[in-house]
Protein backbone atom coordinates (compact mmCIF):
# COMPACT_ATOMS: atom_id res chain seq x y z
CA UNK A 1 0.00 0.00 0.00
CA UNK A 2 1.19 3.51 -0.82
CA UNK A 3 1.34 5.93 2.08
CA UNK A 4 -1.50 8.44 2.19
CA UNK A 5 -0.21 11.96 1.46
CA UNK A 6 -3.51 13.79 0.92
CA UNK A 7 -6.81 13.46 2.79
CA UNK A 8 -9.80 15.19 1.22
CA UNK A 9 -13.17 15.87 2.85
CA UNK A 10 -15.91 16.42 0.29
CA UNK A 11 -18.43 19.17 0.93
CA UNK A 12 -20.48 21.96 -0.53
CA UNK A 13 -19.22 25.43 0.45
CA UNK A 14 -20.91 27.96 2.72
CA UNK A 15 -22.88 28.11 5.94
CA UNK A 16 -26.10 26.93 4.25
CA UNK A 17 -24.53 23.51 3.62
CA UNK A 18 -22.21 23.15 6.62
CA UNK A 19 -24.53 20.90 8.64
CA UNK A 20 -25.98 18.89 5.74
CA UNK A 21 -25.37 15.16 5.30
CA UNK A 22 -23.48 15.78 2.04
CA UNK A 23 -20.73 17.48 4.10
CA UNK A 24 -19.90 14.44 6.26
CA UNK A 25 -16.49 14.13 4.58
CA UNK A 26 -15.61 17.68 5.60
CA UNK A 27 -16.72 16.97 9.19
CA UNK A 28 -14.13 14.17 9.31
CA UNK A 29 -11.29 16.33 7.89
CA UNK A 30 -12.18 19.28 10.17
CA UNK A 31 -11.99 17.01 13.22
CA UNK A 32 -8.75 15.41 11.99
CA UNK A 33 -7.17 18.87 11.74
CA UNK A 34 -8.45 19.83 15.21
CA UNK A 35 -7.06 16.64 16.78
CA UNK A 36 -3.65 17.62 15.40
CA UNK A 37 -3.95 21.22 16.69
CA UNK A 38 -4.28 22.60 13.18
CA UNK A 39 -6.94 24.74 11.58
CA UNK A 40 -7.88 24.67 7.94
CA UNK A 41 -7.01 27.88 6.10
CA UNK A 42 -8.35 28.98 2.73
CA UNK A 43 -5.79 28.62 -0.03
CA UNK A 44 -7.13 29.88 -3.37
CA UNK A 45 -4.59 28.07 -5.56
CA UNK A 46 -6.03 24.78 -4.25
CA UNK A 47 -9.68 25.94 -4.42
CA UNK A 48 -10.24 24.96 -0.81
CA UNK A 49 -9.30 24.97 2.85
CA UNK A 50 -6.01 23.23 3.60
CA UNK A 51 -3.80 22.18 6.49
CA UNK A 52 -0.69 20.08 6.97
CA UNK A 53 -0.40 17.47 9.73
CA UNK A 54 1.99 14.77 10.87
CA UNK A 55 0.30 11.37 11.07
CA UNK A 56 2.59 8.82 12.71
CA UNK A 57 5.67 10.38 11.14
CA UNK A 58 4.01 10.94 7.76
CA UNK A 59 3.59 14.39 6.22
CA UNK A 60 -0.09 14.60 5.19
CA UNK A 61 -1.99 17.43 3.50
CA UNK A 62 -5.65 18.02 4.29
CA UNK A 63 -8.11 19.57 1.84
CA UNK A 64 -11.76 20.58 1.97
CA UNK A 65 -12.67 21.95 -1.48
CA UNK A 66 -14.60 25.23 -1.66
CA UNK A 67 -15.90 24.32 -5.09
CA UNK A 68 -19.35 22.82 -5.21
CA UNK A 69 -19.45 19.04 -4.81
CA UNK A 70 -19.67 18.30 -8.54
CA UNK A 71 -16.45 20.30 -9.13
CA UNK A 72 -14.37 18.74 -6.32
CA UNK A 73 -11.89 17.21 -8.76
CA UNK A 74 -10.55 20.66 -9.67
CA UNK A 75 -9.34 21.21 -6.09
CA UNK A 76 -8.02 17.66 -5.62
CA UNK A 77 -6.13 17.73 -8.93
CA UNK A 78 -4.61 21.15 -8.17
CA UNK A 79 -3.17 19.95 -4.86
CA UNK A 80 -2.14 16.53 -6.18
CA UNK A 81 -0.29 18.09 -9.12
CA UNK A 82 1.42 20.74 -6.98
CA UNK A 83 2.74 18.21 -4.44
CA UNK A 84 3.20 15.36 -6.96
CA UNK A 85 0.72 13.11 -5.17
CA UNK A 86 -0.52 10.02 -7.01
CA UNK A 87 -4.17 8.87 -6.91
CA UNK A 88 -3.31 5.85 -4.72
CA UNK A 89 -1.80 8.25 -2.15
CA UNK A 90 -5.14 10.05 -1.70
CA UNK A 91 -7.94 9.27 0.78
CA UNK A 92 -11.29 10.91 -0.04
CA UNK A 93 -13.85 11.07 2.78
CA UNK A 94 -17.46 11.35 1.63
CA UNK A 95 -21.06 10.76 2.63
CA UNK A 96 -22.40 7.33 1.66
CA UNK A 97 -26.11 6.69 1.03
CA UNK A 98 -25.62 2.92 0.90
CA UNK A 99 -24.46 2.71 4.54
CA UNK A 100 -26.60 3.52 7.58
CA UNK A 101 -25.62 6.29 10.02
CA UNK A 102 -23.08 4.91 12.50
CA UNK A 103 -21.24 2.81 9.92
CA UNK A 104 -18.08 3.79 8.07
CA UNK A 105 -16.09 1.75 5.55
CA UNK A 106 -12.84 2.22 3.69
CA UNK A 107 -11.90 0.91 0.26
CA UNK A 108 -9.47 1.39 -2.58
CA UNK A 109 -10.93 2.08 -6.00
CA UNK A 110 -14.31 1.07 -7.30
CA UNK A 111 -17.18 2.95 -8.85
CA UNK A 112 -18.53 6.31 -7.78
CA UNK A 113 -21.96 5.10 -6.65
CA UNK A 114 -23.54 8.12 -8.33
CA UNK A 115 -21.67 10.47 -5.98
CA UNK A 116 -20.97 13.64 -7.98
CA UNK A 117 -17.86 14.52 -5.98
CA UNK A 118 -16.26 11.12 -6.61
CA UNK A 119 -17.37 11.24 -10.24
CA UNK A 120 -15.59 14.56 -10.79
CA UNK A 121 -12.41 13.44 -9.03
CA UNK A 122 -12.27 10.29 -11.17
CA UNK A 123 -12.75 12.31 -14.35
CA UNK A 124 -9.91 14.70 -13.42
CA UNK A 125 -7.58 11.70 -12.93
CA UNK A 126 -8.31 10.38 -16.45
CA UNK A 127 -11.04 8.11 -15.05
CA UNK A 128 -8.56 6.44 -12.68
CA UNK A 129 -10.66 5.19 -9.73
CA UNK A 130 -7.66 3.96 -7.71
CA UNK A 131 -7.80 6.32 -4.77
CA UNK A 132 -8.88 5.40 -1.24
CA UNK A 133 -12.37 6.28 -0.08
CA UNK A 134 -13.66 6.70 3.45
CA UNK A 135 -17.39 6.08 3.12
CA UNK A 136 -19.31 7.71 5.98
CA UNK A 137 -22.80 6.26 6.27
CA UNK A 138 -25.68 8.73 6.19
CA UNK A 139 -28.50 6.32 5.30
CA UNK A 140 -30.92 6.46 2.37
CA UNK A 141 -34.34 8.15 2.18
CA UNK A 142 -35.81 4.99 0.63
CA UNK A 143 -36.85 6.68 -2.61
CA UNK A 144 -34.27 7.70 -5.23
CA UNK A 145 -36.37 10.76 -6.09
CA UNK A 146 -35.81 12.08 -2.56
CA UNK A 147 -32.00 11.68 -2.54
CA UNK A 148 -31.11 15.30 -3.40
CA UNK A 149 -33.28 16.75 -0.64
CA UNK A 150 -32.01 14.09 1.76
CA UNK A 151 -28.26 14.68 1.25
CA UNK A 152 -28.81 18.45 1.36
CA UNK A 153 -30.80 18.12 4.58
CA UNK A 154 -29.57 18.23 8.15
CA UNK A 155 -29.75 14.88 9.98
CA UNK A 156 -31.87 14.67 13.14
CA UNK A 157 -29.93 14.67 16.42
CA UNK A 158 -30.13 10.88 16.84
CA UNK A 159 -28.59 10.28 13.39
CA UNK A 160 -26.02 13.05 13.86
CA UNK A 161 -24.77 11.31 17.02
CA UNK A 162 -24.33 8.03 15.11
CA UNK A 163 -22.47 9.81 12.30
CA UNK A 164 -20.25 11.63 14.82
CA UNK A 165 -19.44 8.35 16.61
CA UNK A 166 -18.55 6.73 13.28
CA UNK A 167 -16.29 9.68 12.42
CA UNK A 168 -14.54 9.29 15.80
CA UNK A 169 -13.87 5.64 14.97
CA UNK A 170 -12.67 6.62 11.49
CA UNK A 171 -10.15 9.01 13.08
CA UNK A 172 -8.77 6.21 15.27
CA UNK A 173 -8.57 3.95 12.21
CA UNK A 174 -6.77 6.66 10.22
CA UNK A 175 -3.94 6.42 12.76
CA UNK A 176 -3.97 2.62 12.39
CA UNK A 177 -3.92 2.98 8.59
CA UNK A 178 -0.80 5.15 8.73
CA UNK A 179 0.95 3.05 11.39
CA UNK A 180 -0.07 -0.55 10.65
CA UNK A 181 -1.49 -0.50 7.12
CA UNK A 182 -4.74 -0.89 5.25
CA UNK A 183 -5.70 -4.44 6.34
CA UNK A 184 -5.49 -3.71 10.07
CA UNK A 185 -7.37 -0.43 9.63
CA UNK A 186 -10.28 -1.98 7.74
CA UNK A 187 -10.45 -5.01 10.05
CA UNK A 188 -11.21 -2.67 12.93
CA UNK A 189 -13.24 -0.12 10.99
CA UNK A 190 -15.49 -2.65 9.28
CA UNK A 191 -16.42 -4.32 12.58
CA UNK A 192 -17.60 -1.01 14.08
CA UNK A 193 -21.22 0.09 14.32
CA UNK A 194 -22.30 2.99 16.52
UniProtKB/Swiss-Prot annotation:
One of its GO terms (molecular function) is peptidyl-tRNA hydrolase activity. Disulfide bonds: none annotated. GO terms for biological process: protein quality control for misfolded or incompletely synthesized proteins; rescue of stalled ribosome. Belongs to the PTH family. It comes from the Bacteria. PROSITE patterns: PEPT_TRNA_HYDROL_1, PEPT_TRNA_HYDROL_2. The keyword tRNA-binding applies. The active site is at residue 22. GO terms for cellular component: cytoplasm. This is Peptidyl-tRNA hydrolase. The keyword Iron-sulfur does not apply. Hydrolyzes ribosome-free peptidyl-tRNAs (with 1 or more amino acids incorporated), which drop off the ribosome during protein synthesis, or as a result of ribosome stalling. Catalyzes the release of premature peptidyl moieties from peptidyl-tRNA molecules trapped in stalled 50S ribosomal subunits, and thus maintains levels of free tRNAs and 50S ribosomes.
Amino acid sequence: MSKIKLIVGLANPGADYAQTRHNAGAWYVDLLAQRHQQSLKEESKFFGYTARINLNGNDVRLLVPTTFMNLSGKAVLAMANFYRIQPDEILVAHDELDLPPGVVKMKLGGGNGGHNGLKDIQSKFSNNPNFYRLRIGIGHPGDKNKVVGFVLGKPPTSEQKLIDDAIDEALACTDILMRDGYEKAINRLHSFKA
